[in-house]
């Protein structure tokens, strides 16, 4: 048997990336395809329908564009014979969901629905279902639902049930016309294979499914809304299969589009961050993997099911078969730094960066690195896009304290870097306090490759060594590993994801170690961060929510005046 290859496709927030990998984990070729429609958060394409605040949609056709463009590109770049590609795997943002009809066609592609926002793909960061999430949590808590502690006591507005309920409340006709609500990762697998299967990862983390108990009871859904009573056996029906399972094989039509052979094995869908865990070679407990990009997803393996405040979930076999997979997260990290660079930096910084031939991020990082911990006099709460863990509240907002007339842009930048590190420390503390050990940190994604200052701050704030993924596209490599498992040993692949990770997972030799004097200062700053965190985040002062409410009320009044 000659040399064999697998392809992993990572569907991110703004683009899709295909990576062609050999069975030793060497990356042979990669290609990024930006989504033509990007993130739709202001106006629907073609119809000019205005979207309300907190909406974030996507066009499902963009996902197919990635298959049609990126896969042929990596084959062409590498010169690899398509016959030597034994499997394809994908990972996706989640919960990114869409309504489809009985043939599997997204409702937004039908002429009668294209002007209706609720027919489109709801991206993971669509936060307009917060009212439904609040009521769901209130009812679940009153009923003493057993599932609630598994999700840190709160179900997020980002997840499947809240989003479905929002559709039912605001567009009941679209709900009625929907045959299935699908995770986008499962829909793309359906398009590739013709097989409609749901993966255990998104079902467990985003749809309140449990390996032993299944979905919550009909009685619970009836208590939410009588119209939801039969949701799980109708619009959420379908087999739920473990990660690493073969979903099916490429159809002739899709193989022709992608430049591969019909019959090529396709792994069940996965979540971007979760695919990154084997991507860095982590297949055992005690090693926290941080997938760092626009947001951070924190993943950890355990041998028991423990209840931890603010977790996105604990799911048996949810990341690596044989372990309980814990997920936590921060709703905005890279997005905060990008916001500051785009919206908050004075013109002279942009001009200076341009003159030096560096990006604004690099210019700020270089100057921020000259400061010692505490020297900026600033402290921030990293809630620019709400708080995912441990407070699970999208209505919280960002805060910076300590400004003076002498505050410089690089000081603000450093304070924002530090704030996200404190947010990660809060998550680590929650794990440890509830009996789930965190001994080592692993970082992957775009940020660790770009920002050394950020990684040193994380090492100092958490007082733990951080290992960095060797790959710049770890989730795609992880997805490729699952493709190797789906292909099977008989076709040159692997027996299990553990075997695949041991042979294909890689980290850099360079690590970031905590600097003791920095650790001591950050410990004091973290105590202050915790006071702010609890004061503004646990109900003592809900000023952030009141401000958000007044903002929305004022906007609504302004819009109604414009319409009249």
From Swiss-Prot:
SUPFAM superfamilies: Actin-like ATPase domain. Its EC number is 2.7.1.16. One of its GO terms (biological process) is L-arabinose catabolic process to xylulose 5-phosphate. The keyword Transport does not apply. Pfam families: FGGY_C, FGGY_N. It is an enzyme of class 2 (transferase). It comes from the Bacteria. One of its GO terms (molecular function) is ribulokinase activity. InterPro entries: ATPase_NBD, Carb_kinase_FGGY, FGGY_C, FGGY_N, Ribulokinase. One of its GO terms (cellular component) is cytoplasm. Transmembrane segments: none annotated. Coiled coil: none annotated. It catalyses: D-ribulose + ATP = D-ribulose 5-phosphate + ADP + H(+); L-ribulose + ATP = L-ribulose 5-phosphate + ADP + H(+). Keywords: Arabinose catabolism, ATP-binding, Carbohydrate metabolism, Kinase, Nucleotide-binding, Transferase. Pathway: Carbohydrate degradation; L-arabinose degradation via L-ribulose; D-xylulose 5-phosphate from L-arabinose (bacterial route): step 2/3. Belongs to the ribulokinase family. PANTHER family: FGGY CARBOHYDRATE KINASE DOMAIN-CONTAINING PROTEIN, RIBULOKINASE. This is Ribulokinase. It comes from Geobacillus thermodenitrificans (strain NG80-2).
């Amino acid at each position: 048997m000659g040399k064999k290859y697998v392809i992993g496709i990572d569907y991110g927030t703004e683009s899709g990336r295909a990576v062609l990998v050999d069975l030793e984990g060497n990356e042979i070729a990669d290609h990024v395809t930006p989504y033509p429609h990007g993130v739709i958060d202001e106006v629907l394409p073609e119809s000019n329908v205005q979207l309300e605040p907190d909406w974030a949609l996507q066009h499902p056709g963009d996902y197919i564009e990635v298959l049609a463009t990126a896969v042929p590109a990596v084959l062409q770049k590498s010169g690899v014979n398509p016959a030597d590609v034994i499997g394809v795997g994908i990972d996706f943002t989640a919960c990114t969901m869409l309504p489809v009809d009985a043939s599997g066609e997204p409702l937004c592609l039908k002429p009668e629905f294209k002007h209706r926002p609720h027919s489109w793909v709801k991206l993971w960061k669509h936060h307009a279902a917060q009212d439904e999430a609040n009521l769901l949590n209130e009812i679940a808590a009153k009923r003493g639902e057993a599932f609630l502690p598994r999700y840190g006591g709160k179900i997020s507005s980002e997840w499947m049930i809240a989003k479905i309920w929002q559709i039912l409340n605001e567009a009941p006709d679209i709900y009625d016309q929907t045959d299935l609500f699908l995770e986008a990762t499962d829909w793309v697998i359906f398009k590739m294979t013709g097989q409609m299967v749901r993966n255990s990862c998104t079902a467990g983390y985003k749809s309140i499914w449990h390996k032993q108990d299944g979905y919550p009871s009909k009685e619970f859904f009836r208590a939410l809304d009588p119209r939801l009573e039969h949701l799980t056996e109708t619009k959420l029906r379908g087999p739920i299969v473990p990660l690493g399972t073969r979903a099916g094989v490429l159809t002739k039509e899709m193989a022709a589009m992608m430049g591969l052979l019909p019959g090529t094995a396709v792994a069940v869908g996965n979540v971007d961050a979760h695919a990154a865990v084997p991507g860095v070679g982590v297949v055992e407990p005690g090693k926290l993997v941080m997938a760092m990009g626009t947001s951070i997803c924190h993943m950890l393996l355990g041998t028991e099911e423990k209840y931890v405040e603010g977790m996105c979930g604990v799911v048996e076999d949810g990341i690596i078969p044989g372990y309980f997979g814990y997920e936590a997260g921060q709703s905005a990290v890279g997005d905060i730094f990008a916001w500051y660079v785009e919206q908050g930096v004075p013109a002279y910084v942009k001009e200076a960066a341009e003159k030096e031939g560096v990006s604004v991020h690099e210019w700020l990082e270089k100057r921020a690195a000259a400061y010692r911990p505490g020297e900026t006099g600033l402290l921030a709460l990293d809630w620019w896009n709400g708080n995912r863990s441990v407070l699970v509240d999208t209505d919280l907002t960002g805060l910076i304290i300590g400004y003076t007339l002498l505050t410089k842009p690089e000081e603000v930048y450093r304070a924002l870097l530090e704030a996200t590190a404190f947010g990660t420390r809060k998550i680590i503390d929650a794990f440890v306090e509830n009996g789930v050990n965190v001994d080592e940190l692993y970082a992957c994604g775009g940020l660790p490759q770009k920002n050394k200052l950020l990684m040193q701050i994380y090492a100092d704030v958490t007082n733990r060594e951080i290992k960095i993924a060797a790959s710049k596209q770890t989730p795609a490599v992880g997805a490729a590993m699952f493709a190797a498992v789906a292909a099977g040993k008989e076709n040159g692949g692997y027996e299990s994801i553990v075997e695949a990770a041991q042979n294909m997972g890689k980290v850099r030799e360079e690590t970031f170690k905590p600097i003791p004097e920095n650790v001591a200062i950050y410990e004091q700053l973290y105590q202050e961060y915790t006071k702010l965190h609890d004061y503004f985040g646990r109900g003592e002062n809900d000023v952030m929510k009141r401000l958000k409410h007044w903002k929305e009320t004022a906007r609504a009044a302004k819009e109604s005046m414009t319409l009249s």
